[in-house]
Each structure stands twice: as C-alpha cells, then as structure tokens.
Swiss-Prot record:
SMART domains: BTB, ZnF_C2H2. GO terms for molecular function: DNA-binding transcription factor activity, RNA polymerase II-specific; DNA-binding transcription repressor activity, RNA polymerase II-specific; histone deacetylase binding; sequence-specific double-stranded DNA binding; zinc ion binding. A zinc finger (C2H2-type) spans 420-447, 474-501, 502-529, 530-557, 558-585. The gene is HIC1. Residues 63-126 form the BTB domain. Binds specifically to the gamma F-1-binding motif of the gamma F-crystallin promoter. May have a regulatory role in sclerotome specification and/or differentiation. Isoform 2 functions as a transcriptional repressor in lens cells. Residues 8-23, 266-278, 351-361 have a biased composition (Basic and acidic residues). SUPFAM superfamilies: beta-beta-alpha zinc fingers, POZ domain. It comes from the Eukaryota. PROSITE patterns: BTB, ZINC_FINGER_C2H2_1, ZINC_FINGER_C2H2_2. This is Hypermethylated in cancer 1 protein. It comes from Gallus gallus. The keyword Zinc-finger applies. GO terms for biological process: intrinsic apoptotic signaling pathway in response to DNA damage; negative regulation of Wnt signaling pathway; positive regulation of DNA damage response, signal transduction by p53 class mediator; regulation of transcription by RNA polymerase II.
Length: 676
C-alpha cells in the first residue's frame, strides 16, 4: 500500500501534465485561429497595382482601347477608364476607339488627366498657372472625373482664384466652364441682386456644381460689381466664362411685367461668326460646345466684348434702342431675332451698356443664329448670346463643324449615359432618335448659313465666271453640282449629310453608320482587336476571325446545291456558283475547271444523255480513284448521280468506286440532264 501511493500520485501528476499540455495546445490553437481571423492589409497594395498598370500603359501592354485627341493617340485599359470616368465608361462599352472633342480636351491636358487616372497625382501644369489648371478643371468636368474636379477646385481655392456659384439666383442651368485670356476666376455675382421692377422669379432648378465657376478678366484688388459683373464704365477684358443665358429645359422661365415690352437686343459684334468677306475675329466660346483650352485675344480686341456673354442685362421698356444703325447693323438685324434678356439690371445700367456698345470700336460682322432657349408662353423662342468665333488664321474644319451644332445647347450631365454620339461635333445623346434629329439639324443649320451667305453676295468672286456659273450660282460644298436657287441646293445637300452623317476624322470619308466609320478608322490606326486563339493571327473584323477559325476546325458550312461541293467561306461558294450559270436555253450548266479529274468530268458530261446510257457509262469505270486528290470529287459526283439516276448516295458511291478507268477527253461545259 505504501508503495502504491507514489504510483497513484505519479499517475495523478502525469495526468496533470497531460492536461496542462492540452490546455496549452488549446490556447495556442485559439491564438492561431484569432490570428487567422484578424484582417490583414498591405497599405501600398493599391498604389503598387496602379503603378504596374501605368507601366503597362506606357509600354502598350494589354491596352484594349485607344483615345484619339486631335492627332494624338493614347492607349489605355478599359477597366481603368470605366472606373475613373462616368463619361468614358459609357463609351468603352461599345468601342475600342474613342474620339474626344478637341474643343473640350487638348492632347496636353488629356495627358495630364490620363496620368492622374493611373497615378492619382496631377502633374505640374504648363506655364500659365491657373490658366492651365482651369483647362484641366473644365476637361475633368466634361469627362466626369469627380476626384480630379475636386482637386482642381481645391488648388484654385487655395490661391483665392475660385468662387463657387450659389444656386437660387437665376432660372438658368449652368453651361460649361470657359476660359478667357486671363485665368483669374471670379464669382458671377456676389451678394443679393438689387431689386428691379420685375415679377419675382420662381426657384431655379439645382445648378450643376461641377462647372460652377467663371474664368473672368484680371481685376485684382477691385471689388466686384453689386451684381458680380463688370460695370459698363470699366473696359475690362472679356469675361468669356460660363454661358448663363441658356434656359433650363424644365426649369421656370423669367417673365416680364405686362407693361414691359420686349425689345430686340443690340447685336454684339464679338458674338458674330467670321465670314469670308469680313476680317477674322476671335472671342467668346460656344457654350454648348466649349473649348477649355482655346485662348481669346488679349485686351479689348474685336471679338472680345466685355459683355458678350452677359445674361443679366434687362431690356429697358422703351420703344426703340437709342442707337443709330449703319449698313452693317442693318445687315445684322436681318440675321438676328429679337432677344429678351434676363431681369437683373435696371434701366439706367442697361442704357449705359448700350451707350458703351455704341462707342465700341469693333468692325461689324455678319451674325449667326444662336441657341434657342425655352421662354414663357407669351414670348417667342429667343437665342442665347455666347458663341465661338474662328481664330485669327481663318476658319478651320473644326470651326465649321462647331457651327453645325449652334442650334442646340447640350449638357451631357443632364442626359446621363450618352451612348449615341454625333461624330462631327462630338455631342452624345441617350437615344438614336435624338441623334437622328440632331444630325438632321446639322444639315439645316449648315444650309441656312450657306444659303444666307449666297443671298447676301450671290455673285461674289465670280469675276470671269461662265454663263453656267451665273445661271447656277449655288454650288454644293460636297460635290461639283450647282443649282439656280438655294431651296434646290438644300434638297440636294440633304443627300450628303442625312444619308452619310458620319465622316472619318482622319481622311474625311463619310459613312451611313457610326460602326462602319469606327471600323474604317481602325484601318488608319492599324487596330486588329480580334485575335485567333490557335495561331495568334489578328483581324479587324469579327466575321474575318470566324472564317479563319474554320481553317483550324475544318468546318465547311456552305454547300453548293447543284454539285454538292462544300466551302468554308461564303464568298468561295458565290464564286463557285458562277460556274453553274444558266445557258441560253435556261438549263443549268456545270463548268468544271481543269483540276477536276477525268472521271467526274466525263461522267457529268455523259449525264446529259439518257438515263440508261449514263448508268452504263458509270458501270464501266474502274481504278480511277487511286489518286487521293480524286476523292475530293467523289461526294459531289455521288450526290449528282443519286439525284439524276434515282440511286441512293451510298449506292452511287459504291458504283463509282468500282468504275473502270476512262480517259479524260471530255468537254468542260455540259448540260444537266432533265427528264422528259
């Protein structure tokens, strides 16, 4: 018994050690499980991933989309663009080749934006400071990149050059941010507008905060006008900023008192387009088609009217504007419609404005119809006041295309995903119906300008023109045809733009469908997005790849219904069917080439005889199929024999396999047997 106690104690001690080991193991397991459940993170993972993608982009590795900006090409990845830009997301879904509006984004600005998308860092702008930063801000708003928009606004606020527009003052939706000669950004108006003798305006629709800034003139250290505008007595540089004269399509419209009478606004020379018979001018930018990087001429040059885009002037309730008009202004009034302006200045200020315009030394130029805006029921549709003029070097093809879209004030943000894009002007639309209406309006606007110009100077520069040019002075801009009157010319030119509204931006060739134009542009850029998985060969079209894959699979889906021949490509079958063209008597003919062997040729030739004779000839053929190439003609001949001799295809093949050898002296063109 005494000896058993130590054993029992040892056993108890042994169990206690096992228990302790088990407890330690359980604790270690719990700690391991706890460590596994804890979240782990590599802080630099996302940055390293973007850096790798950016390296791939610079090398063109796995890039699946090309962005064309003017003459510059940028390769990128669709996933990255779609995750960064709502506008680009709607485009990369459908196309591998994107054309951005060069009036909205310049190649240099887009390079900065693309670097920001891949790195999250905005590089140093070119010399110009806030001017370039303003262009980046406008382009980022156009491309709908909220992170870059916020970064640009933050930088501008730090420098004190940015003021945010507050909603509720005017019944307008903001247009696009536009840049003037000097990049100082000021508020459109500060404080509460002075009361005027007008009816109160209903609350406005929410303003678009992405474009809530004005790129105004350099007036450092000078307080703003009570309405946020340059007073008439200050000859400041043109505030080519946001076009606030465009009414919201769904918002309330301003109304005047019943005693007020609408007056035609005095035509402003800076907002007029350049013509071939007037000196080129440069000034404000088109609100519906803004250019965030196009400079305006410095100072008070013609085309840089300080209030060319001022939407806040009120028309004084007087009978006629107190301005004498010369021949140039009479010509302008033939082109322009009456335009009631916004109720934001009183009569005295409006009169000062008119007097200042009278003293302005700017050459008259032919105006251009502006954007129609939605007014109240008792007002006729009027036009806004901001538009783009040509550069000092004369109108370019891009400027001509800009004039096509002057009838619409388009805001991409209000239309969501714009999947239908007008190629000439770059505007996007949510439906094909709106795009078709827009393209038709393109043509009407173009013809309106052409017809009006021809009416103004019908025989300009004719000099020693012949009698035909005098009798038909209206010439088509797309072809050499000329007509007696502009109405006939208008009907003719519709055949150019309405049937082929999509021109190639590289060579100018026009197409009826946007997809056809995109595929055509791939030939210029060498794009072959469709690759064969078996051999790696690449193609520009999907159907070409499908045809190529049949080489690997051996599939021949196209069968000749006359002789039973099979082909991998449809065009080969079409070419083959030409051999079976009907003869003078209407019977189908079989024209076999020299590569078809003697048995097939001779047998088919003799099938033009009676049925018994054909069967006899087939039974005498033998040992002709020793050449493997002759097997290619076995199935067509068997099918042909079965159809005309009443045999099954298996039986016909058996007879042909046992046929004796015959010589190959037979005609190539024979008539198929037709039962009596």
């Amino acid at each position: 018994a005494p000896g058993a106690r130590p054993a029992a104690s040892r056993e108890r001690g042994h169990k206690s050690r096992e228990e302790r080991c088990g407890e330690r193991g359980a604790a270690a397991g719990r700690r391991a499980r706890g460590a596994m459940l804890e979240a782990m993170e590599v802080p630099s993972h996302s940055r390293q991933l973007l850096l790798q993608l950016n390296t791939q982009r610079t090398k063109g590795f796995l890039c699946d989309v090309i962005i064309v900006v003017q003459n510059a090409l940028f390769r990128a990845h669709k996933n990255i663009l779609a995750a960064s830009s709502a506008y680009l997301k709607s485009l990369v879904v459908h196309d591998n080749l994107l054309n951005l509006d060069h009036e909205m984004v310049s190649p240099g600005i887009f390079r900065l934006i693309l670097d920001f998308i891949y790195t999250g860092r905005l590089g140093e702008c070119e010399p110009g400071g806030e001017q370039s930063l303003g262009a980046v801000l406008a382009a980022a708003s156009y491309l709908q990149i909220p992170g870059l928009v916020a970064l640009c606004k933050k930088k501008l606020k730090r420098s004190g050059k940015y003021c945010h527009l507050r909603g509720g003052y005017a019944p307008y939706k903001l247009g696009r941010g536009l840049r003037a000669t000097t990049p100082v950004i000021q508020a459109c108006y500060s404080g509460t507008p002075r009361p005027v003798d007008l009816q109160p305006v209903e609350p406005a629709a929410p303003l678009n905060t992405q474009c809530g800034e004005l790129y105004a003139s350099a007036s450092q250290g000078t307080p703003l006008h009570p309405h946020g505008l340059c007073p008439p007595e200050r000859h400041c540089s043109p505030p080519c900023g946001l076009d606030l004269s465009k009414k919201s399509p769904t918002g309330p419209s301003a109304q005047l008192l019943p005693t007020d009478r609408l007056l035609p606004a005095e035509p402003r020379e800076p907002s007029l387009p350049p013509r071939h018979d007037s000196p080129p001018v440069s000034g404000g930018l088109l609100a519906g088609h803004p250019a965030a990087y196009k400079d305006s001429p410095p100072g008070g040059e013609p085309g840089g009217h300080p209030h060319a885009t001022d939407p806040f002037r009120s028309t004084p309730p007087c009978a006629e504007p107190p301005l004498p008009r010369g021949d140039g202004r009479e010509l302008m009034y033939r082109w322009m419609k009456h335009e009631p302006l916004g109720p934001y200045l009183d009569e005295g200020e409006a009169e000062k404005e008119l007097e200042r315009e009278e003293k302005a030394e700017s050459p008259p130029a032919a105006p251009q119809p502006r954007y129609p805006s939605v007014e109240s029921n008792d007002l006729e549709p009027d036009n806004s006041t901001s538009e783009e003029t040509g550069s000092s070097e004369g109108p370019s093809p891009g400027d001509a295309l800009d004039r096509y879209c002057n009838h619409l004030g388009y805001e991409p943000e209000s239309l969501g995903d714009n999947l239908y894009v007008c190629i000439p002007c770059g505007k996007g639309f949510p439906s094909s119906e709106q795009l078709n209406a827009h393209v038709e309006a393109h043509n009407e606007e173009e013809l309106y300008h052409k017809a009006a110009a021809e009416q103004a100077v019908p025989f300009l520069d004719k000099g020693g023109a012949g009698l035909g040019d005098i009798l038909r002075p209206y010439r088509c801009s797309s072809c050499d045809k000329s007509y007696k009157d502009p109405a006939t010319l208008r009907q003719h030119e519709k055949t150019h733009w309405l049937t082929r509204p999509y021109p190639c931006t590289i060579c100018g060739k026009k197409f009826t469908q946007r997809g056809t134009m995109t595929r055509h542009m791939r030939s210029h850029l060498g794009l072959k997005p469709f690759a064969c998985d078996a051999c790696g060969m690449r193609f520009t079209r999907q159907y070409r790849l499908t045809e190529h894959m049949r080489i690997h699979s051996g599939e021949k889906p196209y069968e000749c219904q006359v002789c039973g021949g099979k082909f991998a490509q449809q065009r080969n079958l079409i070419s083959h069917m030409k051999m079976h063209a009907a003869g003078p008597d209407g019977k189908a003919k079989l024209d076999f080439p020299d590569s078809v062997y003697a048995m097939a040729r001779l047998t088919a030739d003799q099938l033009g005889l009676k049925q018994e004779k054909a069967a006899e000839l087939l039974s005498h053929t033998s040992h002709f199929l020793s050449d493997p190439k002759a097997m290619e003609s076995l199935y067509p001949l068997a099918k042909f024999t079965a159809e005309h001799l009443g045999l099954s295809q298996d039986k016909a093949a058996e007879v042909l396999a046992q046929a004796p050898h015959l010589h190959a002296d037979a005609a190539r063109t024979i008539e198929r047997y037709s039962p009596p």
